Every structure is written in structure tokens, then in C-alpha cells.
Amino acid sequence: MKITKMTTYRLPPRWMFLKIETDEGIVGWGEPVIEGRARSVEAAVHELSEYVVGQDPARINDIWQTLYRGGFYRGGPILMSAIAGIDQALWDIKGKALGVPVYQLLGGLVRDKIKAYSWVGGDRPSDVIAGINKLTEIGFDTFKLNGCEEMGIIDSARKVDAAVAVVAQIREAFGNRIEFGLDFHGRVDAPMAKILIKELEPYRPLFIEEPVLAEQAEYYPRLAAQTHIPIAAGERMYSRFDFKRVLADGGLAIIQPDLSHAGGITECFKIAAMAETYDVALAPHCPLGPIALAACLHVDFVARNAVFQEQSMGIHYNQGAELLDYVVNKDDFKMTDGHFYPLTKPGLGVEINEELVIERSKQATDWRNPVWRYPDGAVAEW
């Protein structure tokens, strides 16, 4: 079997799909994208195609190593996201060729179901509470919420009090009937992160995500040492070499590699195994589309240290398309009591509505994250 063609489709809301075709008619799908930089990743995918077209798709490891090591400069979000989508599509082809789900190729199931959690946004506590109520009605009991707005390197007690008040209202409204993680989104610098984490402890969040940026990872063990709340990070780490450093330094209780940013299934399977040796949990980052989610689930079902899976159903970013809009076999993604179950179709287990993908790709827009500024005009982290 030989790879004959690679086609990309940028799609609403902010996704990109990759179709890899073969001379035997087997097609694989991947989701290579960086939110807000889809065109850059698209260019990288097509640049890398010269190493892929004409190759045997079964040689996933060799293709991955060629894409990663074939250039003197490597790593980073654009290249690793391009590799990730190609890798996902190759696993999809291999599973389809052999007639088995990808998790069977990775050693088989280690669990029967995986808990899903849902992101809940809202500018007011009442909006967040209403969003949680709606999701609990369909079986969710675990959520992720924004931990704070933008915050200066040294900021006021008023900012801290405002962030804590929101969390307090949510905990008061639901008690221990729900669990929620708090995402600082890398908006907070270390001095304020120390204060904010301490003030949030009475409300027992499930985890604190990205309390500081990955570039400031030396603070993860320092912050972890001062709190009993698990620290999570990893969506802006792009290879096992990035994770090697933070795992060796300690501090993280949960790693969150993104299967569409961190080299795909091949790389994230290794990252998960490496984390297990440090007794660190896995919770793949996934605010993206159905192919990315399927890739995450295949790793979740073979990694013993996987604890829960993010998914983007109803997320506020999904303007113009929902999670399963481009999927034919929607029922295969059905959750029961807030859990996903193994996908049973060969490959990634996602049947893509290609006709709709082609049509909607004509309506793609260039999504950009907001640019926030402090009152003094300086750019803030979003």
C-alpha cells in the first residue's frame, strides 16, 4: 500500500481535518491544528507531504521519525501539530486495513469506560451555575471552569477576592455533587498564583490547570509544595522531551498533552507511559473536533493512568459547528452517565461526512483568540 494524496480542510468553528488517501482506496483522517494558527499548520502539513506521499502508511514509526528528525530544526506547536494530524490519519489507515480499532493495535483495552468532563463558561456566576445545571441533566458531574480573569504580575486583593467569590458561589450551589477543575490558562504569574491557589483551597477544586505558563515550569514544583490541590499542565507542551523535563522536576499531578498538538497518537502514547513511571495521571487536552477526540479516546483506553477526558460538546468556541456535526456515526460517541465507551469501528472509529466537510470548508474563517490588555495598555495573557 502507498500513500497517494493528502488534502486539508479548514472548517468552522476553528478546526482543520486532514484526509490521507492510498492506492488501495483506504482513507485515513486526522486533525492537525493550532487554534488561531490553522493556516500555519496547514502550510506545514503540505510542506511535510513530500516525506509522506509515496510511502507505506503501515510504517508509522518511520514516517513519524522522518517528519520529526528529517529537519535540523524541530519541535514547537506548528510542526508538532502538523505531525500529530498526519500520525492520527496513519493510525486510522492501519486500523482500517487490519479491521480493528486503534486501541487494539496499542495492546488492547485497559478499562471499559472513561469519565468525560465538560468545560463551562460564563461571565457571571449565575451563567456558570445554569450551564452546570444543564449538563448535570445529561449525566455530567465533572467540569472545568475559568479560574480567573487576566491578572497582573502583582495585582490587587480585589482581583483575588472576585475570582474566589465566583468559585465559592459554585461550590455553595452544588456542594460535593460535582467536581470541577479550575483553569488559570497561564494568565497568572507566580506571585499571584501562590496567593490565588491558597485562597481557593477551601473550595476543593479537582485540579488547578496551568497556574503559570509552561515557559515558567520551574514554578510547578514550588506551587505544588504549598498546596494539596493537584497541579495540571501540558496543553502547551509538544513532545516527550518537553514532558521529560517537567516530570523529572516534579510538581505536576496531571499531564494534559493534546493529541492534535503533541505529535499525535505515537508520541502521546509514549508520553502517557513516561508519566505513569512518575505516578502522574493523564487527562488529554481536547477542546477540538471529533477526530482529535477519537484519537484521545484510543490512548485513554490503553493508558492505565488516564483519569478523565476533556471534550468540546457545547463549548463556547463552537460557533458554526458542534462536536459531532461532521460525523456520520454520532451514536458511537454517545455518553452514558458522563462516560465514553470504546469506539468499535476499525481505525479511529470516526466516519466523516466528507460531502459536508467539503461544503463547510468553503465557509471557514480565521479564528483568533482575543488580545487582552491591562488598564495601563500592556498586553495581558489570554
From Swiss-Prot:
Site keyed Increases basicity of active site His: positions: 258
Reactions catalysed, as given in the entry: D-galactonate = 2-dehydro-3-deoxy-D-galactonate + H2O
GO MF terms, alphabetically ordered: galactonate dehydratase activity; magnesium ion binding
Enzyme Commission code(s) on record: 4.2.1.6
SMART domains named among the record's database cross-references: MR_MLE
Xref: PROSITE patterns: MR_MLE_1, MR_MLE_2
Recorded metabolic or biological pathway in which this protein acts: Carbohydrate acid metabolism; D-galactonate degradation; D-glyceraldehyde 3-phosphate and pyruvate from D-galactonate: step 1/3
Amino acids binding Mg(2+): 183, 209, 235
InterPro entries according to UniProt: DgoD-like, Enolase-like_C_sf, Enolase-like_N, Enolase_C-like, Galactonate_deHydtase, Mandel_Rmase/mucon_lact_enz_CS, Mandelate_racemase_C, Mandelate_racemase_N_dom
GO biological process: amino acid catabolic process; D-galactonate catabolic process
Main enzyme class: lyase
Cofactor(s) recorded in Swiss-Prot or TrEMBL: Mg(2+)
Site (Transition state stabilizer): 310
Function: Catalyzes the dehydration of D-galactonate to 2-keto-3-deoxy-D-galactonate.
Miscellaneous information on this protein: Reaction proceeds via an anti dehydration.
Name of the protein in question: D-galactonate dehydratase
Gene assigned in the entry: dgoD
